[in-house]
């Protein structure tokens, strides 16, 4: 049993083989039972199974106890027989177990190997089946695609056939109308000719009747009238023949004209195509030249804009320098004027003090002689003269001082007026500068586009944006950018902080990618539409060629119809010629009657 358990462990390879193992164990048990039965049958029923043997042994013992006649020798012989039987049974069992175990091992190993091979074969078969199925599916898909393409081609062919049918119908209608027109013209011509012939015949008959009335006149005038009438009839017949010939010529000319028109149309179409191709080439050349000129003009404009910006900067700097110089000059002038004013004031004060001192001294001198009456009269006269002279000098000095003061006041007023005028002019210059500054604050569309590009690049860093605008101040740039954001022309990229700026950049990149994809899609759609248009143009050209062929055929048919009409007219002319012969016979008969 231990060997059998070890073998079962060795044989257990996979859970899938557990059923085989159980079956093998059942086979082992059945083989054991069969071997025991075979052994019993071989020994002719001498050996009993172990359970029966034990029962028999007990029965013998019971019999021994019951029967006193049994001997001890018989008991020993029975025991020996039992031991030999047991040994033989054990040997047989061991042999049968070993055989069965070996057989089971071999069977299990072979079965497991066969099962493994079978499983591998099954897997390979399944893989092959899957590959075949995939190939079949691919073939089916390809067939479906081919069928779809064929259906599309069939629809295109059907459309082309419908177009051809419509074109053929139109051509047939046109040919039918042309034929009807030609037939109507021919009918009208024939009717006119017949009417003319009938009228001529009626005139001839009337003339014949009149001639018959005047038969037997004595003067022979009726004969002259008859001859004149016959001549008139002959002339009418000749005119009819000429008219018929002219009609035939006209018909031939019409046919020739139709053919020439068709040929001219072909030639004209070819010339038109060539002219259009030449125009396209010339237009392409002109477009290239215009593009080059536009690029040159753009370059010149950019260069001139740079020069203008530099020129404006130099002008602004020169204006500022002039303003600073004027301010410095006005300050220096005001200082010099103040110094002159102070000097004039000091002079006036000194003169006034001198005059006052002199007046006081003179009063003292004038009082002194009155207080000293002891002096001579000469002295009095001298003193009076001197006093009068002094008084006159005093008045003259006062007048001079007053004149000087007036002159100084006038000078001061003039200087003040000049300074006020200068200040006003400086203020005006400042106002003009502000106005010029405001004029530079006007924004153009190009500047707005430039502003949008810089805003998308730098965000709300107005310093970086202002570095690209030399004409504007930083405040103007910022205010204009905020105005564009308020209007909606610019998006507020970082409304809540720096993080939004990064998001804005990512959004811009995504938008740029979307725009590129849209442009690619639009280009592909345009190319597809162009290809469709080219195919339709190709089909239209083919249809036009077919139509031209059909028109040529219809013209040939018309030519044949015209020939038939000409033949008919020729027959009518023969009839008129026969009528002419009949008339000539009538005239000869008339002459014979006269005779």
UniProtKB/Swiss-Prot annotation:
InterPro entries: Homeodomain-like_sf, Myb_dom, SANT/Myb. Residues 60-74 have a biased composition (Acidic residues). Residues 423-434 have a biased composition (Basic and acidic residues). Residues 1-47, 55-74, 82-266, 319-445, 494-595 are annotated as: Disordered. The keyword Transcription regulation applies. GO terms for biological process: mitotic cell cycle; positive regulation of transcription by RNA polymerase II. Keywords: DNA-binding, Nucleus, Transcription, Transcription regulation. This is Myb-like protein D. It comes from Dictyostelium discoideum (Social amoeba). The gene is mybD.
